[in-house]
Amino acid sequence: MITLFTMERDYPYGTLRSTNGSKTKVVLEEKGLAYQTETVSPGAVWKKLPEILAKHPLGKVPWIEDGDLVLYDSTVINEYLNEKSATNPLLPTDPAKRALARAL
């Protein structure tokens, strides 16, 4: 099972979320892949705590763990997830249309 590490925290005035983590969550849902979410505190990310840096060198969210594979950077993660499962492809097969979709 894939584990998505992202940042989310509720405050009295609203919720702080990782936009990139939210994008990855949408991809996981659209692809129908089994996953679990682990919430990382904003302070741990902002301070680049050693336990975060031990997971990957950038110390940012989101990142995923899929078995022994650890990926970070939402674009890389989302491309991997799209290619991992042929179900519900997220990009067109035509190269020009695919490039335009990526530009969005």
Where are these regions (language model features)?
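GST-like domain detector, emphasizing the conserved glutathione-binding G-site
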Residues: 1-104
